[in-house]
Amino acid sequence: MMTNAAQITKQRNSGKRHRACERCREQFELNEPYFLLGASSWHMRCFLCAQCMDPLVGTTYFQFENRIYCEHDFKTLYAPVCAKCNEFVIGQVVHSSNNSYHLACFTCDECNVHLNSQIAYRYQGTILCFLCNQKKPKMRIYNCNKCKQHVDNSDLLTYQENPYHAYHFKCTTCKKVLESDARTIKDDLFCPRCFDFKCEVCFDCKKVIDPQVEQSIFTMNKHWHTDHFRCATCARPFFGHEHYEKNGKAYCRDDFLELIGHHCFICDRNVGGGMVHVFGKAFCPECYRCRGCDKVLHYKDKVMELDLMPLCKKCLGNKTFQKALKYKSL
C-alpha cells in the first residue's frame, strides 16, 4: 500500500515500445505526461479512484491489490475502525478481543497506561491493565473451551453447555462473526437477525415469536402470541377458551351471537340458536308466550296469529276470549 508515491514523467522517443496505461491499455503519445506508480503507468485522465471514479490528481490516494482508491473509499472498504475513538485506523493497528485500536488508543480504561507491552484484561466491556484488573471485584471466571483463555461476560457464548468466546463462531446462515447474543437452534448457531428469519411471526403484532422464551398458539392457520389471540370485537384474549370464527376473525361467544344472532322481540336479548322464529319475529324461549293466556309455548306447539303475535290453540277455542276479541274489534 502506497500513498502519493506517483511521479509525473513524459513518454520519450527511446526506440523502445511505448508504455501503456494501466487502466485503458492505450500507449502514451510522444512527450505525453503520465503518472508512474511503481511499475504501472497511468494517463492523467485515467488516474481515478477504482470505487467512485473521482480524479486522484493532487489528492491523497492509496494503492491496494494493484488498485488505486481515494482516501474516503479506502477507509470505508479496508481500514478498520478503532474501538475506542471510532476513527479509521491507517497504518499500525492493534487487535485485541476481536476489536481494532490505534496504537495510541490501546490504553487501560481506568488509568490510561499504554498496554502495548503488557497483557490486556477484559472486564465488563472495558480493557484494563493488570493492576486495575486486580482491584475489580472478582466474578465467576470462564475459560474458553477452544482457546483456553479467559472469557469476559461481554464475549461469553455458552454452546453445548461449554463457555466460548463468541467470536470463535460464525452464523450458520450469513457467516457473520457471532457476538454474545447469538442464538441456538438444535446444534446450529445463528446471529439474531438470521434466528428471527427461522421463527414464525405473530399475525396480530407482526413481530417474531421467539419459541425459546415466548408461548404461542397455532389456530385459524396462523401463528399468534398467546395473549394476542383475542376477540375481534372486545379484544379480550381467549387463553385457551372457546372461540368462534367468521370471515377469518375470531370472536368470543357473546360477540359472536351479537354478530350473527337475532334479538328477542320482547326482551331484546340475543340467545343465538335458541331463538324461535314465527310471524316474522324472533322470541327467546322465555318470551315465546301465548298472546291470550301468557302461557309459555314450545316451538312445536301449533299457534295462530293475532296481531302478529302467537295465540295458542286453547285460547282460540275459548268462547270468553272470542267474545272479548270481538268486542275489541268493534
UniProtKB/Swiss-Prot annotation:
Q: Name one GO cellular component term.
A: cytoplasm
Gene name of this polypeptide: pin-2
| GO BP term, pick one | cell-cell adhesion
Q: Which sequence ranges form a coiled-coil region, renumbered to this chain?
A: none
Top-level taxon of origin: Eukaryota
Q: Which PROSITE patterns match?
A: LIM_DOMAIN_1 (PS00478), LIM_DOMAIN_2 (PS50023)
Kindly state the tissue distribution recorded for this protein: Expressed in neurons and intestine.
Could you tell me the keywords of this UniProt record?
Cytoplasm, LIM domain, Metal-binding, Nucleus, Repeat, Zinc
Supply the source organism for this entry: Caenorhabditis elegans
The places in or outside the cell where this protein is found are: Cytoplasm; Nucleus
Instruction: Quote the protein name from its UniProt record.
Output: LIM domain-containing protein pin-2
Task: Tell me a Gene Ontology molecular-function term this record carries.
Answer: metal ion binding
